[in-house]
């Protein structure tokens, strides 16, 4: 035997009818592949020990046991020959070849020598001087099978790590004339073998077959095409047979392609990958996407402590949190089960708890919803309201209807069903909010109606006829008439006592009015008049029988006669020396603003004047209360806004900025807004923490009336109804234009109503920003 290169596997055909054939393994790097455990065998190891599995390794994959692989050396050319198994399909043969080349390559390992059938053992041993040498090793990657039928055997012998060598199944039916020997050539680490096909014994000519041989019983007698790998150079070349498919040829090039790809520059790699992907089918690209997607997904939130995760989430706005919740189930739980997160976002966005939120909370508790679900629902109510107003479509649903026979509109109040308007006349008109149809007119007063307020179906009105009247809005019937004032009634308020709940939620407590012993007073009516007095009346129930006043002469209705003749009369608050323009109330506290330049703080349950607030120069036109801080805020003709402590009566702060009469000041949701008459003509938004003016909403023609909440201001000037973003101070849009004057403005969650003068006629304009159901 010629000496071969070290660590190569050589197989020598020893049959006298064959020429010498040497099979040489390709140079495959297997340094990273796990080595099988190898045990040394004695030359005297019996065939029984091998066949019974003593010191023999486990089974190789079944698909590899059906693969035919042959190595050949002709002259200086070294090659590897792969022969198709005709019992398998082309696809299965291709998969086997891929497995051989890339999965189980372990060619440079010693292999096992086995005994041959007794008839041929002696002949073969004579021709193998080095057979069964002391250096024989067993590769435990292979399984040996033996089936006994008399003295004849079907035996499976190991070959390289790629396949098994075995006798055909029909060996038992004929005289066994095949010889297969395996010997280990120690110096060259090579194995020699020979094999005769039994189905060719009848011929003098012997045909060399690659292993494993095919059964003679097979109906496929066609030769299978070999694929030759050329390993004669450092870069192996491929010599495909004329009948080899292009797919197998491409598979054999993969090793070289992969090796070359790793050496390419990054830009060339990207170029090559682009063209490869563009030539892939849809399913292949989907599988690649599944592999790549987890690489670029970083679930960093799961690696943080809960405190850090919450801190990260608190820096996101509502749309971002909604996007986060859609990333995964885990992130959805982080967002949807964190009550503190939604509370923080609620306050950060400048929202405030109101009575509707309390109703939502009660409804959710009845449905057994979690605290987080309640807070989330309340937040999105406020968020959607703001978005609906500030980002409304260009065309808003609008309804206009005229008001006939009036000279002036003194007050407007509405809900989703009705709009109530008082005019400078004894008449009070009630319209349908959706259609503008006049529902009814109330005409019991004998003088002009200047003020009113309603709660539910109870309407209370004040007039220049110096009476307070209580109406049933369901029927339009006047239920009660209260006498006592001696001049025009300028202001009416209905106080229903302390309506705060027992809930301890921090968000609610931030905006809830203080108690002030309101439970000691039943629901009552406040009426203030130009007669310098404030009168308190119990709020009648609509089912109470009408009170008949025995003495309708107002001059004779003093405190004594009212107390004895009117069961609804409570008391009169005296102290002001001029007309009481406006009153504000908080539970048991009443704050009155007068033209005498003072404000007075009263205790309603006792009638005691707690404080006289002096500081304004001139008339006080407007007053409002900050319930969370126990403060009242006033403004008047001196163009100053003053902030007072209700408990001590101390002047806390004076806000400067307006240059003319401040006709209106309102406090809502922790935001203070004031309006000044011409030539100032500005709305100012104030920061109560610093006393500075946060924004100036300038209108050339001045603001006559306005209303605001946590997100917006709706103001009416002489010719335009405008919508402002209170957070930025910017004008969002003009809601109405080309008007003569705007007298009154009011809005709720979904609807804005304005009383305007256009072309010398009075109109009610209704603008709809959403439905009640959407709220």
From Swiss-Prot:
SUPFAM superfamilies the UniProt entry points to: F-box domain (SSF81383), WD40 repeat-like (SSF50978)
F-box domain mapped to chain residues: 298-345
GO biological process: anaphase-promoting complex-dependent catabolic process; conjugation with cellular fusion; establishment of mitotic spindle orientation; microtubule organizing center organization; nuclear migration; SCF-dependent proteasomal ubiquitin-dependent protein catabolic process; ubiquitin-dependent protein catabolic process; vesicle transport along microtubule
Keyword field: Nucleus, Repeat, Ubl conjugation pathway, WD repeat
Function according to Swiss-Prot or TrEMBL: Involved in maintenance of ploidy through proteasome dependent degradation of CDK inhibitor rum1 and S-phase initiator cdc18. Functions as a recognition factor for rum1 and cdc18, which are subsequently ubiquitinated and targeted to the 26S proteasome for degradation. Together with pop2, required for cig2 instability during G2 and M phase and cig2 degradation in exponentially growing cells. Regulates cell-cycle progression under starvation through the rum1 protein.
InterPro entries, sorted: F-box-like_dom_sf, F-box_dom, G-protein_beta_WD-40_rep, WD40/YVTN_repeat-like_dom_sf, WD40_repeat_CS, WD40_repeat_dom_sf, WD40_rpt
Protein name, entry field: WD repeat-containing protein pop1
WD repeats, residue ranges: 444-472, 484-538, 575-603, 615-645, 657-687
